[in-house]
Amino acid sequence: MNSDSLTSQLENFQPLHTLPQWAAFERAAANSPIHTGRLRVLSAAGLDVDISGQGYSPELAQAARALLEVRKFEAVRAQLLDGGIVNITEGRAAWHTSLREPDPDEEVTTERQRLTEFVRQADSERRWRSIVHIGIGGSDWGVRLAVNAFGYARAWRTAHFVANIDGHAMQGGLAGFDPHDTLIVMASKSFTTTETLKNGERALEWLRAAGIQNPHDHIVAITARPDVAEKWGVPSAQVFKLWDWVGGRFSLWSAVSLTTGLACDMDVIAGMQAGAAAMDAHFAQADIDDNAPVQMAISGIVNRSVLGYGSLNIAPYDFRLADLVPYIQQLEMESLGKSANLAGGRVEVPTGPAVWGMPGTDAQHTFFQWLHQGSDGAPVDFIVCRHADHGWAEHHRILLANCLAQREALLKGKSYDNALRECLDAGMPQDRAQWLAHHKVHAGGRPSNLIMLPRLSPYALGALLALYEHKVFVQGLIWGINPFDQWGVEFGKVLATGIANELAGAVPADPGHDASTAYWVQQLAGTAQR
């Protein structure tokens, strides 16, 4: 997309609430209840995406098509996949899909080959028994997810992740490691991220304290600013390239995944890329009614902007996917947590929900009470594998049963009459049964998806992550917001820099602080020196 077409797009932009297609969509969504007798399962890149637990009607499907058409879905999707400028506030492409293409361009291929050779050499020399991965946000969550899901492949090599500026995190990240056989992987797109650089400095001190003469030889950098990393001291041969068109929350597909290759295997990276590429193809080619990311996005719009659900629960019924929750949390909330539309006006409908969750069955004993009987409730994405890898059939059978049962309970609910009958059948006196039955009522009709993976393979995980990426893109398109920037993150970082200088006594306290901030700056000044 050139600057002329970008200008044209902005000039022709219409806020969502002004579109007659949106009014028709709202009416159809409000009159499209969940039907427990209807089955809707979509096949996408080897995943089964069961959207039977969402409201549906032919009228809603037709209204969704009209809404996507007025938003020029097919053209904007092509721009995304072809490297056009879709991140309009920063004037960039969001071409992370090119990083997982089977036959990428020469520059991407070169970085892939460099990454592969680095891992091959480290493996052949049995070097770097400990990896400390330093990065935050998108430079951390995706790699952490992959390593914790598949990290069993390298029993002789350990990976630890440090993201937080809290020094306790860095102390724990280095504890017990041999500095002489530890590689520090620093991932930062700009190579100016405070948390990453400060933790990197601590790592250098730790290496020097162990008597290592050239500590920078133990550092690898992944960044879009190789010049800055080299100036910091990282040898050029150990700097891997990012591109400015790779957003942080999509950087898993880039050289940031070096730690995945070292801790797991390069086959894990290749498998995830292949699965994601298969989902890209599905997203590009499948009809709207059969397109899993599109249909999940439409349901998400209905649940948030029409039905008013303020949050989305992620419930992976696989312990290895514990880190999937914060990964999706960042992807959805950093992408869709916006209230300004593309033209600079305010979006007059609710946008991105709060995303939260934890693996089942732990979740059932933590917050499922709220999901079933709370006054608000939330849509739930259940994610589970058909086959397990532990070999304990009974454990997996019970896990699957719990996943299916929780979803069915949310869908079907329990009426007062059924609850009363249950109490009476248990031999309860009539008056007590009539009273207690009210406490056992489950509203039901609460939306959910069930995403079934064949098993937790790199291919399936890659497809799953791309499914959510494209879902988020479509939701941003419909709402008319840019899902590829994060100005809300930047604002706080600027304020933190100033306050840090005030706490250190380097500058006077800003008289423009609110009363509470001014009080705590005064109270905490000099704390870091004590």
Enumerate the language-model features and the residues they cover.
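Extended, charge-enriched "interface" segments that sit outside catalytic cores
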Residues: 5-124, 129, 398-400, 404, ...
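Helicase-primase coupling helices
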Residues: 52, 350, 354-455
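Phosphate/oxyanion-binding active-site loops and adjacent basic polyanion-contact surfaces
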Residues: 104-115, 166, 195-199, 360-363
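Glycine-rich phosphate-binding loops that contact phosphosugars or nucleotide phosphates
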Residues: 117-286, 498-501
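Short glycine-rich or small-residue beta-strand-to-loop segments that form or flank ligand, phosphate
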Residues: 130-135, 184-190, 310-318, 354, ...
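Short, solvent-exposed amphipathic alpha-helical segments in soluble enzyme
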Residues: 146-151, 175-179, 200-203, 237, ...
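Active-site phosphate/pyrophosphate-binding segments
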Residues: 209-392, 444, 491-500, 504-530
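C-terminal accessory domains/tails appended to large, multi-domain proteins
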Residues: 430, 443-446, 453-479, 484, ...
